[in-house]
């Protein structure tokens, strides 16, 4: 913040007062409505140039419900905080409903040996790097299908790839950095199949800004005839989310889509991909859970659910979207309230986070806590009243946060420390005067005052499942 020592006190006072005041609710409501209307025009075919009226308000509410349904949000028909949060995420420019600049006929190539041409390049990457990422993006789609892709350096190609900006002649202008990243057209002649990338974005090969491979692979899905998916783990989900390219495999939802259009590959063994966990799966079990500054995080494979206590909403995200340096399949986690840190564990390694930032010197080995080599992984962990409890198989270890060493008498059986908890623990966190233990599809509420289990229920009740 600028220091205004030379300015008159009165001006300084008014400046500080203005910046300290919250945005008036009516201004915020108007801003959110404009954001919503603009978004719905682009992606849900809300007619343009609509003046405010009761009829148009009803149309906007219906379009909002359609958008909320697509993203798995409560269908309020209002531009609430959760809806605006989704709308402000960077994404693909192809609409989520209807067709994108209709091309005649069925959105499917009649031949499977497709050609592509890279018209120009982004200045942030070398030509060789762009070529490599584009090749990888096409390979993602060729492995599970009968499609092949060959680059041509001149002449006509089925799919033309270009980096362009703003209004570039296809009636679908880009909007500058961090909005619409790219778009592509369904199969057909002329512009059909072509993919355009916003040249004002910063394109990379890693987790910084926008990974070209991930965005290109998504857009080429449109070039092949796929529409957007409601599965948040699918490549064809409209919003951008970083995933580690070196270990990336096409999700099952996308495999099913491309094979529906073009059939399976000729390989005797068909590839399978990861599936997105379903919150209300009756067999769902968490890998880890922790609190973080009032929110609750439930980890599963490469995903986590985030529960907002105030909003009463739960959203599913990629771990890599928030913490690109963390591995998938985390096994334990806990929040140290005194140090305002969250610790996450996998195997014998652990990481320390301050909100979304990795602390220096991590990952470290769990031997720092005093674990012997015989302990190869931690099942769950929770910190309370200066002690951290670690759960390994049927044993409980207790660590003193001040002395930074294990307490005498530990490890001991979990049931001897927490009567009624007679099972292996998958995840645990503390809320009020309770430890919430998760084991398989159930959770146990253990009262820390009465020292007994007071409730046993389904784990996914925490994900708002009926």
Curated annotation (Swiss-Prot):
Record-listed Ca(2+) 1 binding positions: 158, 190, 192, 194
One GO MF term attached to the UniProt entry: zinc ion binding
UniProt signal peptide: 1-20
Binding site residues for Zn(2+) 1: 168, 170, 183, 196
Residues the entry annotates as binding Zn(2+) 2: 92, 218, 222, 228
Domain notes: The conserved cysteine present in the cysteine-switch motif binds the catalytic zinc ion, thus inhibiting the enzyme. The dissociation of the cysteine from the zinc ion upon the activation-peptide release activates the enzyme.
Record bears the keyword Metal-binding: yes
UniProt keyword annotations, A-Z: Calcium, Collagen degradation, Disulfide bond, Extracellular matrix, Glycoprotein, Hydrolase, Metal-binding, Metalloprotease, Protease, Repeat, Secreted, Signal, Zinc, Zymogen
Cofactor detail note: Binds 3 Ca(2+) ions per subunit.
Protein's UniProt keywords contain Glycoprotein: yes
Family of the protein in this entry: Belongs to the peptidase M10A family.
Activity regulation as described: Cannot be activated without removal of the activation peptide.
Function: Can degrade fibrillar type I, II, and III collagens.
GO cellular component, one term: extracellular space
Residue stretch(es) of the prosequence: 21-101
Organism from which the protein derives: Rattus norvegicus (Rat)
Binding of Ca(2+) 3, residues: 287, 379, 426
Subcellular location: Cytoplasmic granule; Secreted, Extracellular space, Extracellular matrix
Sugar-modified residues: 56, 113
This enzyme's EC code(s): 3.4.24.34
Listed cofactors: Ca(2+); Zn(2+)
Motif Cysteine switch per UniProt: ranges: 90-97
GO biological process: cellular response to lipopolysaccharide; collagen catabolic process; endodermal cell differentiation; extracellular matrix organization; ossification; positive regulation of microglial cell activation; positive regulation of neuroinflammatory response; positive regulation of tumor necrosis factor production
Xref: CDD domains: HX (cd00094), ZnMc_MMP (cd04278)
Paired cysteines (S-S): 280-465
Hemopexin repeats: 277-326, 327-373, 375-421, 422-465
Protein name: Neutrophil collagenase
């Amino acid at each position: 913040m600028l220091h205004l020592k030379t300015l008159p006190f009165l001006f300084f006072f008014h400046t500080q007062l203005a910046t300290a005041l919250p945005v008036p609710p009516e201004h915020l409501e108007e801003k959110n409505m404009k954001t919503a209307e603009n978004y719905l025009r682009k992606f849900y075919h809300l007619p343009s140039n609509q003046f405010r009226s009761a009829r148009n308000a009803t149309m906007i509410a219906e379009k909002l419900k359609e958008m909320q349904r697509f993203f798995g949000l409560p269908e309020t028909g209002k531009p609430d905080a959760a809806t605006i949060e989704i709308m402000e995420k960077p994404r693909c420019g192809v609409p989520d409903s209807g067709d994108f600049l209709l091309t005649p006929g069925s959105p499917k190539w009649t031949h499977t040996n497709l050609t592509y041409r890279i018209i120009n390049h982004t200045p942030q990457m070398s030509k060789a790097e762009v070529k490599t990422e584009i090749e990888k993006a096409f390979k993602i789609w060729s492995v599970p299908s009968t499609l092949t892709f060959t680059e041509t350096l001149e002449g006509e190609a089925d799919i033309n790839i270009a980096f362009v900006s703003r209004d570039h002649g296809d009636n679908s202008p880009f909007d500058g950095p961090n909005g619409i990243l790219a778009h592509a057209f369904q199969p057909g002649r002329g512009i059909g199949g072509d993919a355009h990338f916003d040249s004002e974005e910063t394109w990379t090969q890693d987790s910084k800004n926008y990974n070209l491979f991930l965005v290109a692979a998504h857009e080429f899905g449109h070039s092949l005839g796929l529409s957007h998916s409601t599965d948040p783990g699918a490549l064809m989900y409209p919003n951008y989310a970083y995933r580690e390219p070196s270990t990336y495999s096409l999700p099952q939802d996308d495999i099913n889509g491309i094979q529906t259009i073009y059939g399976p590959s000729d390989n005797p063994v068909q590839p399978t991909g990861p599936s997105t966990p379903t919150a209300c799966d009756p067999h769902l079990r968490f890998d880890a859970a922790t609190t973080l500054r009032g929110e609750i995080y439930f980890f599963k494979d490469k995903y986590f659910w985030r529960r907002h206590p105030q909003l009463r909403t739960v959203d599913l995200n990629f771990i890599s979207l928030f913490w690109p340096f963390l591995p998938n399949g985390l096994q334990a986690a806990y929040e140290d309230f005194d140090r305002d840190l969250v610790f996450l564990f996998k195997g014998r390694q652990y990481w320390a986070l301050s909100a979304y930032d990795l602390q220096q010197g991590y990952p470290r080995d769990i031997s720092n806590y005093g674990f012997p080599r015989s302990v190869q992984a931690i099942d769950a962990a929770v910190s309370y009243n200066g002690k951290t409890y670690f759960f390994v198989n049927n044993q409980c270890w207790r660590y003193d946060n001040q002395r930074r060493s294990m307490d005498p008498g530990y490890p001991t059986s979990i049931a001897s420390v927490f009567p009624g908890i007679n099972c292996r623990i998958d995840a645990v966190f503390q809320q009020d005067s309770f430890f919430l233990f998760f084991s398989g599809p159930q959770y146990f509420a253990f009262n820390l005052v009465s020292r007994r289990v007071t409730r046993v229920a389904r784990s996914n009740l925490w994900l708002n499942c009926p």
